[in-house]
Regions:
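Proline- and acidic/polar-enriched loop/turn elements at helix boundaries
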Residues: 1, 30, 89, 135, ...
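ATP-dependent adenylation/nucleotidyltransferase module used to activate substrates
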Residues: 1-94, 175
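Conserved active-site and cofactor/substrate-binding residues in soluble primary-metabolism enzymes
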Residues: 9, 59, 68-71, 114-118, ...
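Short secondary-structure boundary/hinge segments and terminal tails
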Residues: 35-36, 94-95, 140-141, 194, ...
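Catalytic subdomain that performs nucleotidyl-dependent activation
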Residues: 54-64, 83-160
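Peripheral terminal appendages
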Residues: 104, 145-213
């Protein structure tokens, strides 16, 4: 499910992996759907009247693309009585680096407990082509978009930090002795972990009985 901002290389790699794994696939452009959405919602006038800046629109339109893809995946899954498999890894899920009800919308997360850096090692064992393993991670939601630019850290540093915070329960004084990051950078990631919990938890509901649903 590609758009005008999907790098050609990514489409080529998707086809390559489908062929390697002998998976039947179809390619669907989501541009018509997203453009029609912008027309129906009168997005251009809303941007002018409400003074919505381009950075906010960029993120909102990127999230829309992810949610369109999720809707299409579930449509095809319903037709075939399939489940939807997620692609989120532990690094992304812990800091909320995914679109709620977009790429985060799935039935199972097979690699959800594996850090990005661990996946690179596993990918070599699984025979994934080196071109795919070594290219910069990106979602292609807008031109030039790259994961590590948005996160503000390389995955190597992020995974080391997450391991110390989550798996080892280390405080900042301990962490800073073991990694070349500032207190501000460490706290920024801690905030992402806390502030994104709603993305991986069921919606909260007022308790009016003694039993949970």
């Amino acid at each position: 499910m590609y758009s005008s901002t999907t790098p050609d290389e990514d489409r080529k790699h998707a086809r390559l992996m489908a062929n390697i794994l002998d998976i039947r696939y179809i390619e669907v452009s989501i541009d018509t759907i997203s453009n029609e959405f912008f027309n129906i919602t009168d997005t251009e006038n809303i941007k002018k009247l409400d003074y919505i800046n381009e950075d906010i629109f960029k993120v909102a339109s990127g999230n829309l693309k992810a949610r369109i893809r999720m809707s299409l995946l579930y449509y095809y899954a319903n037709l075939k009585n399939y489940i939807v498999i997620g692609t989120g890894n532990r690094s992304e899920l812990l800091i909320g680096y995914f679109t709620k009800y977009g790429d985060g919308g799935c039935d199972i997360e097979p690699i959800g407990d594996i850090y990005k850096t661990q996946l690179r090692i596993l990918a070599k064992d699984w025979g994934i082509p080196e071109d795919i393993i070594s290219k910069p991670p990106r979602a292609g939601l807008w031109p030039g978009q790259k994961d590590e630019d948005e996160i503000g850290l390389s995955y190597d540093k992020l995974d080391s930090l997450l391991y110390m915070i989550i798996d080892k329960n280390m405080d900042n004084d301990e962490i800073i002795k073991n990694i070349d990051l500032s207190i501000e950078e460490i706290n920024r990631i801690r905030s992402k972990i806390v502030n994104s919990r709603h993305k991986v938890e069921s919606p909260q509901s007022p308790r009016t009985s003694g039993k949970l649903i």
